[in-house]
């Protein structure tokens, strides 16, 4: 009976968590270190995830440009992840968007720079020989 009440308040059908527990369980089981998942741990992980998402959204909304429009955008989330020391670990997951043409130009410049470095290294090797 106690397991049936997990994830729901005792005095009603209002759930303690909004995220689907089955999805959280699948994500947790995808880790090779996890062999079994306790129901209480599952509910606590789901609640912690909700609180984290709420914190990220609140910080992004407060510091983002979407406040004037009363909207939260991807760029607000990416900026918050990059600027906040606490959320810095998300910078790789939430990169700032750039145009494909800019990205291709950056790749080309990087490739040319690497080729120049290789050419400089081969000249040095020939001079020593």
Swiss-Prot record:
Coiled coil ranges: 104-120
One GO location term (cellular component): pericentric heterochromatin
Chain positions found as N-acetylalanine: 2
Residues where N6-acetyllysine is found: 102
GO biological process terms held by the UniProt record: chromatin remodeling; nucleosome assembly; regulation of DNA replication
Subunit structure: Heterodimer with POLE3; binds to DNA. Component of the CHRAC ISWI chromatin remodeling complex at least composed of SMARCA5/SNF2H, BAZ1A/ACF1, CHRAC1 and POLE3; the complex preferentially binds DNA through the CHRAC1-POLE3 heterodimer and possesses ATP-dependent nucleosome-remodeling activity. Within the complex, the heterodimer with POLE3 interacts with SMARCA5/SNF2H; the interaction is direct and enhances nucleosome sliding activity by the SMARCA5/SNF2H and BAZ1A/ACF1 interaction. Within the complex, the heterodimer with POLE3 interacts with BAZ1A/ACF1; the interactions are direct.
Function: Forms a complex with DNA polymerase epsilon subunit POLE3 and binds naked DNA, which is then incorporated into chromatin, aided by the nucleosome remodeling activity of ISWI/SNF2H and ACF1. Does not enhance nucleosome sliding activity of the ACF-5 ISWI chromatin remodeling complex.
Entry protein name: Chromatin accessibility complex protein 1
Species the sequence originates in: Mus musculus
Gene that this sequence comes from: Chrac1
